[in-house]
Amino acid sequence: MKPFTVLIPTTQNVVGFTDITLEDQDVSPIICVNNNMTPLSISADYNNFVCAPSGIIEKYTKLSSYRIDLSSEIDSGESWQLGFFIAHIINHFGKLVFSQENQLILNNMDHILWCSGLINSHLEISDVSYIKTKLLISKSVFDQAIEKNKKILICVSNGNLDEVKTFLNNPENIHYKNYISVQSFSNAKEIFTKIKFPKNIFKDKMYLSKKSLNMIFLLIFLLITIPIFAFVYKSSSNYLTLNELKDNNNHIQL
């Protein structure tokens, strides 16, 4: 599997992941900036985003507590959801390349995803606002990508696609043509197909869960029924033996 870097554009700046740490199960998920100890204001929303039954991260990773460190703040909105989901899944397989506080694009980053979108519990992607602003804010990052000969895939909803195309087709941005591409998606799962990440990562997890559940039901059924059958068999055998003794007059008479 190829390694990937995920970038989250906001109306203020472009944010990268500097670390994702697995925490103890009883600890609430939080978001911080560059290993600081103060959680960001969106940590409560992130908790709902991660933890079952409302969240989607625990559903696919079976893990419920993380600490995310970002290169800079995200203080509001929900358009971070798509990028966070993609980053979590890629990181779960050990293929997320982290940014640094003052350097979002490193020399060892060959596959970069720029993600902005809102997702629901079925991973369906909804449109978000301020795409044009986010693209303009991202121009310095796009220029860094060109300097380092890196390519960026912009991932957005179907409804936000035209805004991105308009930006890329602007004569002022023609130099991005060979380095930055855009693809729209209706569901976050489609992104993993596009980037050629294992296509069955979601299907296999669901299949394994159902298979494990069926095995548990089978074991419970056997644990209940085997003792019952054994008792019935033993009782029937004793009854038949007693009848044979009576029929053969082999019982003791006093």
Where are these regions (language model features)?
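Peripheral, non-AAA+ core regions of ATP-driven protein-machinery
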Residues: 1-251
